[in-house]
């Protein structure tokens, strides 16, 4: 299947023995059994493994119906959330929906005054609907933005504002109570799913549906990838092999992982990936610092460091198949010095830049290569599920909890004290 992912260590052979990677994966074969069982020891955090427990046919139909209503009536749809509450949706929307009948705007991801003021100006004269996503409805950024935006809606639309507001939170939370009291539509943020693992719940799917993403195809890609990983032997399992390679390189002194991609549509996906691994793996003084590099643009900046900088970075190339060759480069009679490009397409240029980068960088640092299909709903579904499973496997190998974030909670407590919040 084109959306499945393959791992190659060809460009890491000077730093990493493939047999050692397979041996390490084999030593952790029990992690596949744990995954098949739905990570029983973390049942209250691994709801994302039970794909259709929270996202069944009735849930999908309800999301599709609400999304169709918003597309009929809205000029602008505002997604209020931060981090795991919006990264998955944003990565798919920005990649797959370039032409939009409804403008999507983002709020609740910054405390900068300029951002909320700019957003309010962009809303003027438009028919606006909003979705506030907050699992426990205590995070500062979405809470503050929601207060400003709901006031705007009620001042602009009066009683009609209620149907323009939907909220995604945990059942019986404060946000759920506000929905019942004010007539806002409520969607579920499952208790058993953390924000960074929430792509396949109403958290991620509802905004995608509003923007016209085929959420059924996305779920299909995730289901196929999950079935593939849970059915593969340890020594042939791409997620377990990727986790094993990362772990071995960490043990050999590498301290950062650069996700490099030559498809600009993956830019927001890389932000999701950074949060997934940073928040899951970075604790107890351990973990690879997750970074990203968008090419070929950043070959002219980070490429220098990757080829001749400090030897602490491993590079993972995420390669998607091209869905188009792009325009052909044809001569126009001018002696511009680029005659060697005559007859070539942009896909040829991209492939050449990718290959040259892997060859050049692999002389200085280990380069892993992950290959998948062209950008599509199925591919993104597969990518989300692949990396979530690989992340859990990596954390298990490192001996850290993939589902908590004590450092984030500590910063929040300090901020709340500074703002005068009691308790």
Residue ranges and their predicted role:
Residues 68-232, 413:
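Glycine-rich phosphate-binding loops that contact phosphosugars or nucleotide phosphates
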Residues 85-88, 113-115, 138-141, 173-176, ...:
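Flexible loop/turn segments at secondary-structure boundaries
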Residues 1-68, 332-340:
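Extended, charge-enriched "interface" segments that sit outside catalytic cores
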Residues 56, 106-109, 135, 139, ...:
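Hydrophobic alpha-helical scaffolding
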């Amino acid at each position: 299947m084109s959306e499945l992912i393959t791992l190659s260590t060809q460009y890491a052979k000077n730093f990493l023995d493939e047999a050692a990677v397979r041996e390490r994966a084999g030593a952790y074969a029990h992690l596949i059994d744990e995954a098949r069982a739905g990570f029983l020891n973390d049942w209250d955090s691994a709801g994302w493994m039970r794909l259709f427990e929270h996202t069944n046919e009735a849930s999908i139909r309800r999301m599709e119906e609400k999304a169709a209503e918003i597309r009929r009536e809205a000029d602008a749809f505002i997604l209020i959330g931060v981090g795991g509450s919006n990264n998955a949706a944003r990565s798919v929307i920005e990649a797959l929906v370039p032409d939009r009948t409804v403008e999507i705007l983002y709020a609740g991801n910054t405390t900068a005054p300029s951002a909320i003021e700019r957003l309010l100006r962009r809303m003027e004269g438009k028919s606006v609907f909003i979705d506030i996503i907050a699992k426990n409805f205590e995070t500062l950024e979405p809470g503050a933005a929601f207060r400003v935006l709901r006031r705007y809606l009620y001042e602009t639309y009066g009683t009609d504002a209620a149907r323009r507001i939907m909220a995604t939170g945990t059942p019986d939370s404060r946000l759920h109570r506000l929905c019942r009291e004010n007539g806002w539509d409520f969607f579920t943020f499952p208790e058993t799913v953390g924000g960074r693992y929430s792509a396949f719940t109403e958290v991620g799917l509802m905004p995608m549906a509003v923007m016209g993403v085929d959420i059924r195809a996305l779920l299909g890609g995730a289901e196929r990838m999950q079935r593939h990983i849970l059915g593969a032997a340890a020594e042939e399992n791409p997620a377990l092999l990727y986790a094993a390679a990362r772990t071995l390189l960490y043990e050999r002194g590498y301290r950062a992982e650069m996700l490099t991609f030559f498809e600009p549509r993956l830019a927001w996906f890389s932000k999701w990936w950074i949060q997934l691994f940073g928040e899951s793996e970075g604790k107890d003084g351990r973990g690879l610092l997750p970074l990203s590099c968008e090419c070929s643009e950043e070959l002219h900046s980070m490429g220098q460091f990757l080829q001749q900088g400090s030897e602490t970075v491993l590079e993972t190339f995420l390669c998607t198949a091209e869905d188009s060759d792009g325009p052909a480069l044809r001569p126009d009679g001018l002696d511009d010095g680029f005659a060697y490009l005559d007859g070539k397409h942009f896909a040829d240029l991209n492939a050449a830049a990718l290959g040259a980068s892997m060859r050049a960088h692999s002389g200085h640092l280990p380069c892993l290569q992950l290959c998948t299909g062209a950008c599509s709903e199925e591919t993104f579904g597969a990518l989300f599920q692949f990396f979530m499973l690989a992340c859990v496997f990596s954390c298990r190998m490192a001996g850290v909890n993939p589902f908590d974030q004590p450092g984030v909670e500590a910063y929040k407590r300090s901020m709340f004290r500074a703002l005068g919040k009691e308790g």
